[in-house]
Each structure stands twice: as structure tokens, then as C-alpha cells.
């Protein structure tokens, strides 16, 4: 795609990553009623349709596009902003016809001074919409699948085989496939947008999208272009701004590219909420910011009764995480004094955070100053961000396990991180695959092919059915169950730390800038990990300690390893192709 819009004055030119139209054949073509053809493409994608009518075709037609299906037909009155549209015209015999839906006013608006402009797709494509099914009224002849081709917009460089995940839990495998495809399908705009309703980038959406894109395909352009757009067009929630710091930190860890970081570093200082810091170092909130700004979670019904106050634990947890990341980024650029200042601020404000928000009587973090209420968010955000002291973690974890999924699909990214990072992978995986309507199992069982904006329609009646912020398992299963993450910027050294839960096995392929990591582990009476690292990459490895295990072997030879907190920590860095056995 070309640069986004035209007259934007930025130090960094705005671009969109390359996207193109791919031709896709239907999986089935049927006639549900006389004169009606129903075309099913198997999955939802953003696009339009190319139709080749038979020779001699004439008369009128109506083409219906739909995301939802009901009673064997496209649902023409879907809930909320689930997509349905139609286009009518006259057949042109012997001509290949591109049929596109009408323009949607909201997701093509170009700004009113209050709302960022929607991302426009190329005019030469015609209008695109998310759809799986097409119904054609007035089809003038025999139905042949070759007559119908969906023109679907995806990343031009997407590589389907770049990543893989498979485990002993078939539901988990289906969740992975749903989330991976969700990342692919939502690349249609060249930057990360929040779904079809608005087609606008938001910082939190973009960061979650970035993590899952990294886990499913080796691409950095989408995240970088989304970041540059959001620096120009920031959005309203308080906690969304620090997500831009998270995005740059994630890019730095993936690429080690200081040249990209350097011209963006100063802009990040405007995203860490320093303008709202009081004399004690905490971020404060006025009445307007409490009413609209401090978001905690979205939709608002997902906040677990959170009590908003003049200084709250969630906003301050985000502030501290951003400060910690800024210290690392400053060091990466050789800004030694700034890095030191950030570290000192983090230590000082972190102590105030503990004193202000930790409730010694309950062992939990309170929502804010002046309340003893403890929402789940006030506890998993600090835990995920490394703010909870070691001696306080057990109580916080117990609370999280008891509470369950009392947060949105957005915040679930951080709830899962908090649990996986602190030895509760069994419970994290159980939440992913739980019965009921607040899990990814519910999404896959619903038949959706792209993740939703919310757990269910009843939790957000106007939700999109094409929202990549609901695809967190794409990165969580790669990072934690397979266990691969960068140990140093640029992946010169990886950390391999598989979290097994109750799974008997898992295997997969993790894309990195240095080439794919292949992981295959089995967890039974012992633990076996087959690992293949790309050339030029080393790995620090730790593995589960099977009950009663006493020794670790690497390629058949006894390895130096230390037993710590139920895991064997290998003392020497590994490279190439290795087999690790715990006995």
C-alpha cells in the first residue's frame, strides 16, 4: 500500500505495510431456494467478490454479503455491528464482474478534529467488507464454483507456514488456529485497526496485535507503521498511551534495531503520563479523567466493580511499567543519565505504589486511594508488570485463581501473563479452554473464524466479530507453552522455558528474525524436549522437573543443571539441534 493519507506533517513519514488482494475459491456452492445461490468461503475475510456470469446472462441481480448465518441463510438482521450488506445491478454477459458492497460512512470518515481518521483502503480495490457467505439472487444459469472468487485483502508478505502450534489438547489447537487466522485476516488495512466498525488504530489493540503477529509471522512493518500512525493520532484512554512504550520495547527486543528506535525515543516521553504525576510520584486523576480517560478495562462492564479514585493502582501500574521500559530504551541508545534517572524514579515511585495500594489486611492491591475494594485488575496488572514483591505473590495468585475470567478479552492478555509468569500455567490454560461464555473455547465453539471484540454478544452488543485484540492465545501459546522468547534484543540469545500445565505434549514453530525455532516436547514420566535453533542463535533453557527427577541429559550426556522452584535450569547456553531429557 501507499503512504497513509497524504498531507501529514511528521518527523517520520506515515506508511502502511504492503497488502494485496488474494483470489480465494469457495468451499461450497449450493442453491438453498429457487433462483438463489449461496456461496461459502469457509472463513471470514475482508474483501469483495468477482463473479463470472454464464454466457447469455441478463436481468437483475442482488448480491448479499454476510458475517453471520442463521437458518441456512445469511443473517440479514445481525446483531450490533456484525456485518451484512448488499449490492444490486444488471448482469453483463461474458464479463468478469467485481461486486462490492456500498461504502460505510463510519469506517471511511476522515476526521472531525475529535476522531482520528479511519484507514482507507486503495480505491482500485473497490469497497471491501468482512464476509464469509455470499447469496446471489437472480443467478441466470448453472452454478459452477469457478464462477465465484473472493478477492481477499491480506498482508502481501504473509507466510502461512511461518508458525505452527499443536498440543495434546484439541480445543487448544483450535484456539491457536482461530487466533492465528485472526491476525492474518485483520492485516487488510496495512496497519493494526480495531475492527471493521471504526477501522482506526488504538494503542492497546495495536500492542496486542503486535505480540500475536510476531508469534505467527516474521513481520515488523505492521507494528512499526501502526506505531507511527498512533504517535500522530493518539486515542483517549489513559492507559492506552503507555502501550506505545510497550510497542517500542517489543520492537527493540525483536530486532535490536537502535536506528529505528532513536528518532522515536523523545516522543515516548509524552506517553508515560508524567504530566499527571503528583509530588509523591504517583499519577493522579481529576474528575474529568476519572469520568472518561482512566479505562481499566473495556467495555466498562468488565471492570469487576473497580472503584475509581484520584490515584488508582491500574493507571499507576501502567506508568511504572512504562518507566521501566524507558530505562531500558534509554540504555539502548547510550543515554546513561536518562536511564539512571528512570531507574531511580521507578524505585522511588515503586515504593510509594506498594505503600499506597497494597492492603496488608487482605494481601491484595486496592483499586485506589480511599477505597479498600480490590478488583481483579488491581492485582493482575501489577503482577504481570513485575511490581508484586516475592513475598506477596502467593496471595495475589490465589485471588486470581479464585476469581477466574473477570476481565475482558483485552485485559485477559495481562491476566494470562501474570499467571504463566508465576507458575500458574495449569490454571491459565484451564481459563482459555473453560466451559461457559467467557473463554476462547466459547469463541471456537460458536463457529466464528475471527476473534471477537468481547467474550460474547451480550457483553458488548455493538461488538465487532473481527477484532484482533481477542487473539491473545496466538502469542501466549508460543511464548509460554512452547516457551520461546528473546533473552536479549535481536534474538541473538533466546529463552526456552516451556510451561506444560496438564498437556502431554506440544510442538511448534516460532518465527524469529534469525529464522524459526522448532520446539517439540513430551511430558510423561519424564520430560523430553527436542529443540532446533537457527544458526547464530543460542538459548538459555529451563524445563519442568518431573517428579523425582535427579538428572538432565543434553544429547545423551549429563548436563550441568540447577533445580529451582520445580524447574531444571541448564547452566550452559545451547545451540543448534539438541535433545534435553529429564530423568
What are these regions (language model features)?
Residues 1-3:
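Positively charged n-region of N-terminal signal peptides that target proteins for export
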Residues 5-16:
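Hydrophobic h-region of N-terminal signal peptides that target proteins for export
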Residues 17-190, 205, 219-223, 259, ...:
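Extracellular/oxidizing-compartment recognition motifs
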Residues 20-22, 72, 344, 351, ...:
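Non-catalytic C-terminal accessory modules of carbohydrate-active enzymes
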Residues 133, 143-221, 225, 235, ...:
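Active-site acid/base region of carbohydrate-active enzymes
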Residues 198, 244-245, 283-284, 301-310, ...:
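C-terminal capping/lid segments that line or modulate ligand- or cofactor-binding pockets
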Amino acid at each position: 500500500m501507499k503512504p497513509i493519507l497524504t498531507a501529514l506533517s511528521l518527523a517520520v513519514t506515515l506508511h502502511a505495510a504492503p497488502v494485496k488482494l488474494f483470489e480465494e475459491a469457495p468451499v461450497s456452492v449450493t442453491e438453498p431456494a429457487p433462483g438463489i445461490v449461496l456461496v461459502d468461503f469457509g472463513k471470514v475475510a475482508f474483501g469483495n467478490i468477482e463473479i463470472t456470469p454464464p454466457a447469455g446472462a441478463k436481468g437483475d441481480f442482488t448480491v448479499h454479503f454476510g458475517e453471520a448465518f442463521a437458518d441456512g441463510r445469511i443473517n440479514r438482521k445481525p446483531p450490533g455491528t456484525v456485518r451484512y450488506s448488499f449490492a444490486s445491478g444488471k448482469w453483463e454477459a461474458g464479463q468478469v464482474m467485481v461486486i462490492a458492497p456500498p461504502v460505510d460512512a463510519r469506517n471511511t470518515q476522515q476526521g472531525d478534529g475529535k476522531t482520528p481518521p479511519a484507514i482507507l483502503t486503495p480505491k482500485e480495490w473497490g469497497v471491501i467488507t468482512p464476509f464469509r457467505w455470499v447469496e446471489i439472487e437472480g443467478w441466470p444459469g448453472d452454478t459452477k464454483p469457478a464462477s465465484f472468487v473472493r478477492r481477499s485483502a491480506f498482508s502481501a508478505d504473509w507466510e502461512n507456514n511461518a508458525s505452527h502450534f499443536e498440543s495434546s489438547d484439541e480445543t487448544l489447537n483450535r484456539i491457536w488456529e482461530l487466533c492465528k487466522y485472526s491476525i492474518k485476516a485483520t492485516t487488510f488495512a496495512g496497519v493494526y485497526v480495531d475492527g471493521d466498525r471504526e477501522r482506526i488504530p488504538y494503542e492497546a489493540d495495536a500492542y496486542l496485535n503486535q505480540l500475536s503477529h510476531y508469534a505467527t509471522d516474521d513481520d515488523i512493518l505492521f507494528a512499526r507503521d501502526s506505531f507511527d500512525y498512533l504517535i500522530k493520532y493518539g486515542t483517549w484512554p489513559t492507559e492506552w498511551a503507555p502501550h506505545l512504550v510497550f510497542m517500542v520495547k517489543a520492537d527493540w527486543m525483536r530486532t535490536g534495531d537502535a536506528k529505528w528506535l532513536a528518532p522515536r525515543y523523545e516522543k515516548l516521553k509524552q506517553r508515560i503520563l508524567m504530566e499527571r504525576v503528583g509530588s509523591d510520584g504517583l499519577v493522579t486523576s481529576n474528575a474529568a479523567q476519572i469520568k472518561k480517560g482512566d479505562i481499566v478495562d473495556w467495555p466498562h462492564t468488565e471492570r469487576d466493580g473497580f472503584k475509581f479514585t484520584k490515584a488508582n493502582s491500574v493507571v499507576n501500574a501502567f506508568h511504572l511499567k512504562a518507566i521501566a521500559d524507558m530505562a531500558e530504551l534509554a540504555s539502548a541508545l547510550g543515554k546513561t543519565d536518562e536511564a539512571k534517572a528512570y531507574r531511580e524514579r521507578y524505585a522511588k515511585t515503586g515504593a510509594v505504589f506498594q505503600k499506597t495500594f497494597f492492603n496488608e489486611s487482605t494481601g491484595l492491591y486496592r483499586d485506589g486511594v480511599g477505597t479498600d475494594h480490590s478488583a481483579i485488575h488491581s492485582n493482575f496488572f501489577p503482577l504481570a508488570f513485575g511490581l508484586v514483591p516475592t513475598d506477596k505473590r502467593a496471595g495475589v495468585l490465589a485471588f486470581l485463581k479464585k476469581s477466574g475470567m473477570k476481565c475482558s478479552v483485552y485485559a485477559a492478555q495481562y491476566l494470562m501473563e501474570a499467571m504463566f509468569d508465576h507458575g500458574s500455567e495449569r490454571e491459565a490454560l484451564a481459563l482459555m479452554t473453560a466451559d461457559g461464555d467467557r473463554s476462547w473455547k466459547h469463541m471456537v465453539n460458536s463457529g466464528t473464524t475471527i476473534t471477537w471484540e468481547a467474550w460474547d454478544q451480550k457483553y458488548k452488543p455493538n461488538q465487532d466479530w473481527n477484532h484482533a485484540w481477542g487473539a491473545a492465545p496466538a502469542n501466549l501459546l508460543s511464548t509460554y507453552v512452547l516457551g520461546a522468547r528473546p533473552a536479549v534484543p535481536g534474538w541473538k540469545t533466546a529463552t526456552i522455558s516451556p510451561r506444560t500445565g496438564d498437556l502431554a505434549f506440544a510442538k511448534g514453530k516460532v518465527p524469529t528474525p534469525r529464522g524459526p525455532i522448532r520446539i517439540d516436547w513430551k511430558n510423561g514420566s519424564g520430560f523430553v524436549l527436542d529443540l532446533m535453533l537457527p544458526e547464530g542463535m543460542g538459548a538459555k533453557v529451563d524445563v519442568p522437573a518431573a517428579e523425582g527427577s535427579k538428572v538432565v541429559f543434553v544429547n545423551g550426556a549429563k548436563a550441568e543443571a540447577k533445580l529451582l522452584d520445580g524447574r531444571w535450569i541448564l547452566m550452559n547456553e545451547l545451540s543448534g539441534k539438541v535433545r534435553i531429557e529429564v530423568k
